[in-house]
Amino acid sequence: MKNISLLGASGSIGTQTLDVLRSHPDQFRLVAFSVGKNIDYAVKVIQEFSPQIVSVQREEDVLKLQAVSGNTKIVYGSEGLLEVALHPDAEIVVNAVVGSVGLLPTLRAIEAKKTIGIANKETLVTAGHLVMEAARKHNVSLLPVDSEHSAIFQCLNGENEKRISRLIITASGGSFRDKTRDELHHVTVEDALRHPNWSMGSKITIDSATMMNKGLEVIEAHWLFGIPYEQIDVVLHKESIIHSMVEFEDRSVMAQLGSPDMRVPIQYALTYPDRLPLSDTKQLNLWEMGTLHFEKMNQERFRCLRFAYEAGKTGGSMPAVMNAANEVAVEAFLQKRIGFLTVEDLIEKAMNHHNVIARPSLEEILEIDATTRRFVMEQI
């Protein structure tokens, strides 16, 4: 029986993580979780899983939950998030929160020697050098939950990582993959939220449409697998059947395939190095697919992917700036305050405005995050 702490239980990854726990009640126990403002959902999860600690975002929601939570301790805010991450009984901490708020809980959980199921891209994007350094220092495993990184992780099982020639990350292309840049001037929030292949939260669905999601994944892969950016490629693959590939020095290519279902990589992270049945996911029959398609990525068409490569290669504090600018811009687009292509413009402005710090401390990263957010808000 593995004890799980889940950060971000009401989001897309969080709800699918709970599906996995539900499927294997003899294997996993939920000891703590956090939610944002979805208190009705939190009540249902408490009643079903009886965790010891639950954290909510706002203090005013604590009393509401305490009235129905029985013996479950209710905490709130950033301190509450840390309490969930550091629950003494938790063996695995699944970080499924959205945005850079996931950074501090991850670092503290690593210091407490918890195994990390990492679904929060922004943690590695903003502070990859600090996170990987801490993981090495405390001998902690970072197990990828993203389908692409899980695919690479599985392809590398038993392989000599020094023999890697390149990583090939697949991209569905998002909601607007078939639109021209001229057509993108007129797209709506509702259009952007209709992803062709995956069921995801609103922020990541917009990131998928701008291709920033894939850019964040490139930076994440660089840190997780220690591969230079020059050896990480992205290929457009509309069917989302091949989740990523690894090419070795002898030009052999290993690929991980499966029907698009986030519960598969989530469960693999929780059961690693073992596997368990996942009976209600769709079996992949290639003869039903017929044909798989691949296209070279155009970084002028998908400018956010180019920004991510530039930020990653520049290094230091630049990825944190790009990430903060993107979070503010995407939120403004979701609120219908800016157009879709303005997201790219705001990120570019923030990156051009920033003076890079080569090796920022945690305090400097948090300060850069805050100042970048203020700068972008002033531009809107």
UniProtKB/Swiss-Prot annotation:
Keyword presence, Oxidoreductase: yes
The protein's required cofactors: Mg(2+); Mn(2+)
UniProt-listed Pfam families: DXP_redisom_C, DXP_reductoisom, DXPR_C
EC number: 1.1.1.267
Domain of life: Bacteria
Gene3D superfamilies the UniProt entry points to: 1.10.1740.10, NAD(P)-binding Rossmann-like Domain
Residues given in the record as 1-deoxy-D-xylulose 5-phosphate binding sites: K121, S147, E148, S172, H195, S208, N213, K214, E217
Free-text function comment from the UniProt entry: Catalyzes the NADPH-dependent rearrangement and reduction of 1-deoxy-D-xylulose-5-phosphate (DXP) to 2-C-methyl-D-erythritol 4-phosphate (MEP).
The protein's name: 1-deoxy-D-xylulose 5-phosphate reductoisomerase
Species annotation: Bacillus cereus (strain ATCC 10987 / NRS 248)
